[in-house]
Regions:
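Extracellular beta-rich repeat passengers
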Residues: 2-3, 8-109, 113-130, 135-245
């Protein structure tokens, strides 16, 4: 799916009055490595939305095609009471895949979540996601450049612990002994929180940056600003395992 700056491809709700969570989202499954116990990188995972679909493998440069100049708007619908889509979900996607110039508006869960994989993503804008702006787990090891996340003035999240970045080394922090914990790099990142500056769970970020459960992140040239509230700017502690940034 390749648009242009003048004519981006738009995935959105079929409604004149769309709201977040109106439809599912975009999910890409690849064959790149994820965290696991096998030294030969043969571990696979099952998608959150439908466990009939696998992802992961040992192909670092796996190619899932290209996604450029794309808008994803009002995604994040729930498939069950406990499972909801992200705007963009990248499961074990390899670095042979091209993902650039992506705009995600008002996803009902995370704007984008990486489940392992090695894919590199450039130029990503996330506006008013209900949960995390950028979420990483299960051994993600790619490079990210030019990331911009914003909560606009007057926006209200309904999640208990929304974050700018949330990073786990392994899936749900339950596998601290796994090989290939998340270890990724972010260059040029801006997080703007202009939501209400209060202390309750629906009007502030839990953490701007949360690196935990064995994850490691190298963040270069980052700017955090805004009038909104947060409990922690950077937090690397967790009851299951700490992180490293």
């Amino acid at each position: 799916a390749d648009g242009t700056a003048d004519k981006p491809i738009v995935f959105t709700a079929n409604s004149t009055t769309p709201t977040s969570g109106y439809w599912g989202g975009i999910i890409i499954n690849g064959k790149a490595p994820i965290s696991g116990s096998n030294a030969n990188k043969s571990d696979t995972g099952l998608t959150e939305i439908d466990n009939n679909y696998k992802y992961g493998g040992n192909v670092d440069n796996d190619n899932s095609g290209s996604l450029t100049y794309v808008k994803i708007c009002y995604a994040g619908a729930r498939s069950t009471a406990d499972i909801e889509h992200n705007g963009l979900t990248l499961n074990g996607v390899g670095n042979g895949t091209k993902i650039e110039n992506i705009y995600i508006l008002e996803s009902a869960d995370d704007a984008v979540e990486f489940f392992g994989g090695t894919v590199n993503v450039t130029n990503l804008l996330a506006v008013n996601p209900d949960d995390d702006m950028f979420d990483f787990t299960q051994g993600y090891s790619g490079k990210l450049k030019n990331y911009y996340g914003v909560w606009e003035s007057g926006y209200t999240s309904t999640e208990a612990d929304p974050r700018g970045i949330e990073a786990d080394g392994n899936l749900d922090g339950d596998y601290s002994d796994h090989l290939r914990q998340s270890d990724f790099a972010v260059e040029n990142m801006t997080i703007v929180n202009n939501a209400a500056n209060t202390t309750d769970n629906v009007d502030r970020m839990q953490d701007v940056i949360k690196i935990r459960r064995g994850a490691k992140a190298t963040i270069t040239n980052a700017l955090v600003k805004g009038s909104g509230g947060t409990i922690d700017l950077i937090d690397m502690n967790d009851s299951k395992d700490a992180g490293n940034a």
